[in-house]
Amino acid sequence: MAIKRFAITVFSIVFSLGAIAADTTPSESAPSWQADAQKEIKANNYDAAIKTLLAANQPNSADWNNLLGYAQRKKTPPDLAAAERYYQAALKIDPKHRGALEYYGELFLMKNDLAGAEQMLTRLDKICLFSCEEYRDLKEAIAKYKTKNKKL
């Protein structure tokens, strides 16, 4: 009977931790600049997203820096140096910012720095208790990078 109670307790703890880790939905009180920038990014309007974010001028926000880094990295042509500065700023504000860790890892791959990308993956692994989307996405990007570069 004690084993059954122990198993139920462990299951309950594991289940509740998984629910916490999976809850990455943006809050309803997200600032308008964030929603506007995300809308522009979704539409691949990276220059418009950059303008929206710069007008909002929220340099103490990890999300603001992360979105600016993302838009700088994805625009044509990408500004990798600017993207890196924004990702570094986001991680200085919030060292566990999962989006910044994932995207900074992808930036490292763009710069052919596999070791840097793997460092970001290791950091994500430590903060994502039972995996998370950002960890899985970066892990997949690293695997694709390795496969692509084996052929060269």
Model-inferred region functions:
Residues 23-31, 118-152:
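Terminal, low-structured helical/coil segments at or just beyond the last alpha-helical repeat
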Residues 28-56:
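Alpha-helical segment of the N-proximal tetratricopeptide repeat
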Residues 38, 70-72, 106:
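Residue-level recognition of tetratricopeptide repeat
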Residues 42-43, 74-76, 110, 127, ...:
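Register position in tetratricopeptide repeats
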Residues 43-48, 76-89, 112-120:
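Structural signature of tandem alpha-helical TPR/SEL1-like repeats
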Residues 56-59, 93, 126-130:
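Structural marker of alpha-solenoid helical repeat scaffolds
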Residues 64-66, 100, 134:
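TPR alpha-solenoid repeat register
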Residues 67-68, 103, 137-141:
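Canonical tetratricopeptide repeat
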